[in-house]
Regions:
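Accessory "access/gating" subregions that flank catalytic or transport cores
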Residues: 52-169
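Active-site rim segments in enzyme catalytic domains, especially the processed small/beta chain
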Residues: 173-176
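Mobile "lid/hinge" segments at catalytic clefts and subdomain interfaces of large enzymes
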Residues: 1-81
Length: 176
């Protein structure tokens, strides 16, 4: 800091605790990962869309009637996105049963979007929460808290990574 002529700030109260608290780093890294994931996810959506169209896949797999038979997380919303794009395309499909990598697009991508949505919720909760411990309550009591620990954020990040890996594997299978 000195070599760059940056004046050191005066620290007060719990400033040092804030600087060494892992929550700030977790929030920042999660925000970056979330931004990258949203970009990559949309690319994976379009990649599947173009692959499906080039393959002349059976578009019935995206119909509302089919996707309401068994509701997986995000499946209906994802299928509806593809259905709305394909509904006016009248090409006859190559076959009744396409390879699994095509038939499972709405299930896998739907779960991916569900996990991303949940990640956003957990990240916003952490961003807007107080992770201090101890804290001073309104009645001026000093109490210990568990708020510094957020395993939900770590677990949903892991779920997003697993969903992305599953979607990437499907994409890989479609190009073989």
């Amino acid at each position: 800091l000195v070599s760059n002529k940056i004046k050191l700030p005066k620290l007060e109260g719990k400033d040092a605790m804030v600087l060494i608290n892992h929550s700030c780093l977790s929030i920042a890294l999660t925000g970056k990962a979330l931004s990258d994931t949203l970009n990559v996810f949309m690319m994976m959506q379009f990649s599947a869309l173009f692959s499906f169209e080039a393959f002349i896949g059976n578009k019935q797999i995206f119909s509302p009637e089919v996707n309401e038979l068994r509701v997986s997380p995000g499946q209906n919303e994802c299928a509806r996105w593809y259905y709305n794009i394909f509904k006016n395309i009248l090409k006859k499909p190559r076959r009744l049963q396409d390879p699994l990598s095509f038939r499972t697009i709405s299930v896998c991508h739907g779960l991916g979007m569900t996990n991303i949505t949940r990640l956003i919720e957990y990240w916003e909760n952490e961003l807007n929460g107080i992770s201090d411990s101890p804290v001073v309550l309104n009645n001026k009591d000093l109490v210990s808290t568990p708020n510094f620990h957020n395993p939900a954020l770590a677990q949903i990040m892991e779920s997003v990574a697993l969903s992305n890996a599953m979607i990437a594997n499907g994409s890989f299978q479609r190009i073989q």
